[in-house]
């Protein structure tokens, strides 16, 4: 299954911003296509996302990245075996020649990397999840559904970026999705009843102008109960406060509440919330380079709460290993465009599993109809997925693909529920 041709084009993501789409064509006539996502809150240690600058698309065009695929990355792969994913990704990175993919762009490299995997699966006539994960790929992920948006994902007064529901008590993925969707619809009624708007943010969650961060928890608990579910049993809460965005001059600025907290005060803040609410997971609870604070946070609440590194680990095996060595966090968020290739993403997942860290496959705030991460979640038996709320077709595309996979697996499908949590 040798690569015959690589095509790239500029397309739009769910926010109307340009992104890269690549197609890999094989000499057998089969092909694969992939669109890369883009984040709003990005860690400083992520692979470089190459943008054009200038006036076109307000500087966010990706014609340079597309040109790099056409003129450098694609030609380097001609004649290579598409089933040799590690060799493909190494060839792409060799063309780039930097540690952060700064020459070709992580968005250019990733588009080709993912499209190659799809092309190989197409030629073998097997589902993508089976191609990537083999016969043992059978675990459907528990969804983390982002139903209240704040921070960089919304234009409102809520400091924290994501308030999510996790239907850990559901018996299957299909039922978990129903639990979450019903809660989402009841949340709309709760917010309307309190006089709040029900506009949605980048990831499909509501973005009300709440009085405080804690009110987000209150309305969420009310919605869970109105939907007929028991908080802490049927549905738990997961948070992504993304506090790197709030970290300035060594302190955490909660602007909506007029508070400035030290690392220790931020740790106490999370300890208090986890003691009073059914919060089972906190992502980026401290800033990406506050390693000492992360050690103390993990020691204080890590035994009972999943502590997820996103900006902290940026899907990078080297940063994850540093976290493992320092006993920092206990789970990793996996965003393929943070590291910029499929092979490196799967290396990070393997390293996490080897050291008993939880794994959560994640979308970005700028998404598309591409549902690659749904297959990746099942392929790696990750157990958890973050791909937005129960609205916006760019988010629903992933959920619908998981429903299809669950149907294909039939009785072999496993839904871990609460066991998915670290």
UniProtKB/Swiss-Prot annotation:
GO terms for cellular component: cell surface; extracellular region; phosphopyruvate hydratase complex. It holds the Pfam family Enolase_C. Binds a second Mg(2+) ion via substrate during catalysis. (2R)-2-phosphoglycerate binds at residues 161, 335, 364-365, 386. The active site is at 203 (proton donor), 335 (proton acceptor). SUPFAM superfamilies: Enolase C-terminal domain-like (SSF51604), Enolase N-terminal domain-like (SSF54826). One of its GO terms (biological process) is glycolytic process. It catalyses: (2R)-2-phosphoglycerate = phosphoenolpyruvate + H2O. One of its GO terms (molecular function) is phosphopyruvate hydratase activity. SMART domains: Enolase_C, Enolase_N. Keywords: Cytoplasm, Glycolysis, Lyase, Magnesium, Metal-binding, Secreted. Its main location: cytoplasm. Mg(2+) binds at residues 240, 283, 310. The keyword Metal-binding applies. Its EC number is 4.2.1.11. Pathway: Carbohydrate degradation; glycolysis; pyruvate from D-glyceraldehyde 3-phosphate: step 4/5. Its cofactor is Mg(2+). CDD domains: enolase. It is found in: Cytoplasm; Secreted; Cell surface. Catalyzes the reversible conversion of 2-phosphoglycerate (2-PG) into phosphoenolpyruvate (PEP). It is essential for the degradation of carbohydrates via glycolysis. Belongs to the enolase family. This is Enolase. It comes from Deinococcus radiodurans (strain ATCC 13939 / DSM 20539 / JCM 16871 / CCUG 27074 / LMG 4051 / NBRC 15346 / NCIMB 9279 / VKM B-1422 / R1). The lineage of its organism: Bacteria, Thermotogati, Deinococcota, Deinococci, Deinococcales.
């Amino acid at each position: 299954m040798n690569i015959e041709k690589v095509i790239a084009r500029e397309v739009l993501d769910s926010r109307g911003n340009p992104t890269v789409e690549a197609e890999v064509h094989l000499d057998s006539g089969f092909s694969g296509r992939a669109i890369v996502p883009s984040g709003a809150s990005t860690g400083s240690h992520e692979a470089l996302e190459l943008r054009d600058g200038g006036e076109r698309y307000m500087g966010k065009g990706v014609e340079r990245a597309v040109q790099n695929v056409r003129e450098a990355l694609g030609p380097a792969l001609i004649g290579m075996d598409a089933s040799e994913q590690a060799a493909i990704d190494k060839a792409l990175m060799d063309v780039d020649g930097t540690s952060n993919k700064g020459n070709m762009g992580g968005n250019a490299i990733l588009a080709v990397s993912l499209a190659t995997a799809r092309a190989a699966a197409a030629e073998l006539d097997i589902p993508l999840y089976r191609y990537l994960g083999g016969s043992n790929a059978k675990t459907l992920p528990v969804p983390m559904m982002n139903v209240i948006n704040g921070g960089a994902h919304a234009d409102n007064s809520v400091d924290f970026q994501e308030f999510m529901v996790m239907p850990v008590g559901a018996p299957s993925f299909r039922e978990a999705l129903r639990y979450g969707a019903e809660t989402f619809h009841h949340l709309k009624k709760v917010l309307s009843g309190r006089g709040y708007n029900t506009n949605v943010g980048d990831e499909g969650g509501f973005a009300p102008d709440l009085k405080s961060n804690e009110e987000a928890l209150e309305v969420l608990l009310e919605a869970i109960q109105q939907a007929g579910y028991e908080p802490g049993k049927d549905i738990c809460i997961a948070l992504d406060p993304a506090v790197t965005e709030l970290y300035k001059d060594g302190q955490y600025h909660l602007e909506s509440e007029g508070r400035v907290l030290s690392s220790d005060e931020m740790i106490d803040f999370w300890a208090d919330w986890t003691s009073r609410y059914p919060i089972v997971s906190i992502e980026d609870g401290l800033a990406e380079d506050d390693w000492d604070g992360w050690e103390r946070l993990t020691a204080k609440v890590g035994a009972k709460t999943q502590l997820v590194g996103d900006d902290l680990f940026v899907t990078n095996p080297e940063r994850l290993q540093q976290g493992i060595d320092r006993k920092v966090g206990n789970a990793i968020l996996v965003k393929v465009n943070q590291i910029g290739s499929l092979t490196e993403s799967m290396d990070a997942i393997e390293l996490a599993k080897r050291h008993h860290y939880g794994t959560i496959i994640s979308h970005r705030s700028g998404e598309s109809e591409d549902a690659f991460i749904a297959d990746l979640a099942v392929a790696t038996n990750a157990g958890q997925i973050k791909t937005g709320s129960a609205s916006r077709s760019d988010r629903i595309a992933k959920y619908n693909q998981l429903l299809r996979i669950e149907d294909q697996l039939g009785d072999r499908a496993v839904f871990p529920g609460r066991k998915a949590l670290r």
